[in-house]
Amino acid sequence: MYDNPLSAFTNTSLPHQGSAGIQFAVVGAGVVGLCVALEAQRRGHHVTLIDHTEPGKATSYGNAGYLATEIIDPLGTPDVLRAAPKLWLNPKGPICTPWRYIAKAIPWYWRFLNAAQAEPAQRGTDMIHQLNQAAVGAWQRTLADINASALLIKGGHLVVWENTQKRDEAHQLIEKMHRYDIPCEFVDAERLAQLEPELSLSLSHAVFFPESHRLTDPYEVCRALFDAFSARGGVFINAKVDDVHPSSNTHIDLRIAAQTQRFDKVALCAGVWSKQLLERVGITVPLEAERGYHVTFPHDAARIHHTVLSADRKLVLSPLNAGLRAVGMSEIGGTTLPAIKKRYRVLREHTKGLLPKLFDNPQLESTEWMGYRPSFPDSLPVIDLHPMYSRLSFAFGHQHLGITQAAISAELLLDKIEQRPSLIPLDALRVDRF
């Protein structure tokens, strides 16, 4: 780590406009933008990465860090709609919207209700499954290319239940996963205690996913991606992009730090902040900030060996190099309201229910964080070209699966830009699908 991280990242020099080859700009230096920038470099482009924050320090920073390839359903399904009133009214539940934001959120929720009907939800599941199937292989290629394969761990993960009456729920999950060729198995309380001896003895059963992977730490991975990008001649501009202006179909002008810079091609990968830039090029999308919270505890307080997801509490516990991280909440709340402190208290309470040993020390220290998942009502990202200006492309809106799908999204986007055959049909991910 650097004493002053930005001093190590900031490069306000602008790309040489007369250099040979394609001048390719990537707006957004989260994990998706970093993967796109590296993939564009690999394909011979001269790449400039632009963000007003340090690479990997915004939404990507606080992720749980595991590749959630078994999460194949969109956030909205008929089952979720049936459970929504109970989830919404539960003061310790995972779904919430700040009162001050409800009026603004209504249009998004209306589209969410439509997307959660049986037929569109099933289409969403099929699309997410295709992306997730390809996710681990893409990450393996990406990290091997930068000599950082050790940052990806095949550690397996557990979905756990406390309620003994919910064994059928576990078996239904196993049956569904097997239909999609996702390996998993039932785990009783005795074996669960062997796999994770520090978890609460109140846990009844679990489903174990032996083939799942996790990253050592999301920020550590972003740093490795950025370091490789820089070592290969990539330029980073630490500034805000104020405007995007396609000039016919020959180039794209970006307004950066009161200067207009011209690029041959531009990829918008700015997460939830992509929305306002799209409006500058005539596209309106129902993209919202789905705020997520985490609390990170020190390693020595308690240890788990696998990523643990609580089916009852809707919480993820993730063992990272940065510490033991508890991640949760799905809060449609925009980007301007402050974090709601109650969410951190709820996360700690849920964590204590799963891992009581962690709280043996009354002076336990921890860090808190809140970030903005870019979320569409149908839970699918955009991976597409502008319908009128093909030199302008998009990869954003991955909701809970930004870390999972970042590397495969980069490969798919560059294939589309270069008009190569796609491994996965991308029609469902069009920018104008709404």
Language model: regions and residue ranges:
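Active-site substrate-recognition segment that forms the wall
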Residues: 63-66, 71, 75-115, 243-252, ...
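Short beta-strand to alpha-helix junction loop
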Residues: 123-136, 159-169, 194-195, 208-227, ...
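Extreme N-terminal leader/targeting segments of oxidoreductases
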Residues: 1-24, 42-43
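Glycine-rich FAD pyrophosphate-binding loop
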Residues: 42-62
